[in-house]
From Swiss-Prot:
The keyword Metal-binding applies. It holds the Pfam family Metalloenzyme. HAMAP family: GpmI. This is 2,3-bisphosphoglycerate-independent phosphoglycerate mutase. Pathway: Carbohydrate degradation; glycolysis; pyruvate from D-glyceraldehyde 3-phosphate: step 3/5. Signal peptide: none annotated. Mn(2+) 2 binds at D12, S62, D444, H445. It catalyses: (2R)-2-phosphoglycerate = (2R)-3-phosphoglycerate. The keyword Transcription regulation does not apply. Substrate binds at H123, R153, D154, R185, R191, R261, P262, D263, R264, K336.
Length: 511
């Protein structure tokens, strides 16, 4: 039986902007894209910042883009999720935080705050520490100690004193908190099982062992004098005038670890929480029975409470298609294959019933500017054959070229990449239209639209520019103000499938 497939075609890294200088998207000859743009209803979508669950003004990326597209809802990344919770007042109602604080207060125990001391926003954000200090004050805690991990990697390599100053001012203003230890993230945030490093951080925090200082700034100055910058500062103990450590982590204390990214938080957390820990000798007096809180789910091996539990991504587009008995195809070359499968399915590896996948190998070249067409022609050939064989009701396709070649920051190869993709796009969309089907032509974020910086240097990063959306349905009208989360509801709409309640995005096709 002849199928009338609906396809979601993602031109990866294909952003739109008016200025043509350094803009491969604007400079490329793309007769097929232009033809569909002129012939069919079209709009632009926001693919960056809070519209995709990132902080305001932050550029999108392929993982985040495909996650939002497949989920049909804004998927808040951890940083934004915590920021929004602080902004909306949900943070101070968080039961996991309140339980840790109540426990400390009722049992006359200390609260220790562990985490990376910067505003890098990759592993942590210093504003989250300040929010915890405010909450601790509100809850009437007095014994609150900070074990700060110095960054120098996601921020400038000699910026520790900037953050220590901010912390000092906040402690003064809020009226609670003392710095107990400082260590470079090289030690406290190792993820490569270099346990000798972790042990140094642990012994400073649990036993008060290591270089000692009365003044937090002396830790940094001393290190700088020895050519040791923030990331590598040796775990150091802050002491009172009598030489005693300000605080050690003791039996039964509360801990809140405010890093939200798990990978570099797991080892030090295991050291404090794991009964069966054997990676080094923690000593007889190691702190036991801690009320340990992780900001997000770090790992099954970490014995702790989780403040921001994983978000459930049920009823992504693939699951909805499967529930409705529709056959679906995911197709891309190697570079973007995980995006149309794993990320599009909300972080699920396995196929849904009725889901087929075609992986086309990306070319074996050092960098893709050497072969701008990549494997687009092979992707196109495989897909056109599939369309003509009437196998699938829904198709999700990614052309990697504008993004992967765009990362070279080289204009000419990126123009060639887009011209190759345009040729393939024409063959695919025309095959779909010939079957009476529909295509949604769009992108996940910008990149190829800016290849030269204002200083005239190569620009290799993503952009915050809007992305196109074309729906090949004559007579339809697309609404303005759309976001990536609206694409799956639009695909379901074309297939006559009702979107599930979990999808808060809405079809772009105006009724």
């Amino acid at each position: 039986m002849s199928k009338k497939p609906a396809a979601l075609i993602i031109l990866d890294g294909f952003g739109l902007r008016g200025e043509t200088v350094g803009n491969a998207v604007a400079q490329a000859k793309k007769p097929n894209f232009d033809r569909y743009w002129n012939e069919f209803p079209h709009q632009t979508l926001t693919a960056s910042g809070e519209a995709v669950g990132l902080p305001q003004g932050q550029m999108g990326n392929s993982e985040v883009g495909h996650l939002n597209i497949g989920a049909g809802r804004i998927v808040y990344q951890s940083l934004t999720r915590v920021n929004v919770a602080i902004r909306d007042g949900e943070f101070e109602k968080n039961e996991t935080f309140l339980e840790a604080m109540t426990y400390a207060k009722e049992n006359d125990k200390a609260l220790h705050l562990f985490g990376l001391l910067s505003d890098g926003g990759v592993h942590s954000h210093i504003q989250h520490l300040f929010a915890l200090l405010k909450l601790a004050k509100k809850e009437g805690l007095t014994k609150v100690y900070i074990h700060g991990f110095l960054d120098g990697r996601d921020v400038g390599q000699k910026t520790a004193k900037v953050y220590l100053k901010q912390l000092e001012e906040q402690i003064k203003e809020i009226g609670v908190g003392e710095v107990a230890t400082l260590s470079g993230r090289y030690y406290s945030m190792d993820r490569d099982k270099r346990w000798d490093r972790v042990e140094k951080a642990y012994r400073a925090m649990a036993y008060g062992e290591g270089p000692s200082y009365q003044n937090i700034y002396d830790v940094v100055d001393d290190s700088y004098e020895n050519g040791i910058y923030d990331e590598f500062v040796i775990p150091s103990v802050i002491t009172r005038e009598n030489g005693e450590p300000v605080a050690k982590v003791n039996d039964g204390d509360s801990v809140i670890f405010y890093n939200f990214r798990p990978d570099r938080a797991i080892q030090i957390s295991n050291t404090f929480t794991n009964e069966d820990f054997r990676s080094f000798d923690r000593g007889e007096a190691h702190p036991k029975n801690l009320h340990f809180v992780c900001f997000t789910h770090f790992s099954e091996t970490v014995d702790g409470y989780v403040a921001f539990k994983p978000v459930n991504l049920d009823n992504t587009v693939g699951e909805v298609l499967a529930q409705n008995g529709l056959k679906q195809l995911r197709i891309a070359e190697t570079e973007k294959y995980p995006h149309v499968t794993f990320f599009m399915s909300g972080g699920r590896e396995e196929e849904f019933p009725g889901e087929d996948r075609i992986l086309i190998n990306s070319p074996d070249v050092a960098t893709y500017d050497l072969k701008p067409e990549m494997s687009a022609y092979e992707v196109k050939d495989a897909l056109v054959a599939d369309i003509n064989a009437d196998k699938h009701d829904a198709i999700i396709l990614n052309f990697a070229n504008p993004d992967m070649v765009g990362h070279s920051g080289m204009l000419e190869p990126t123009i060639k990449a887009i011209e190759a993709v345009d040729e393939c796009l024409g063959a695919v969309v025309d095959a779909i239209l010939a079957k009476g089907g529909h295509a949604i032509i769009t992108a996940d974020h910008g990149n190829a639209d800016v290849l030269i910086t204002e200083e005239g240097k190569p620009h290799t990063a993503h952009t915050t520019n809007p992305v196109p959306v074309i729906v090949t349905k004559k007579g339809a009208t697309l609404r303005e103000g759309g976001i990536l989360a609206d694409l799956s509801p639009t695909l379901l709409d074309l297939l006559g499938v009702e979107k599930p309640k979990e999808m808060t995005g809405t079809s772009l096709i105006q009724k």
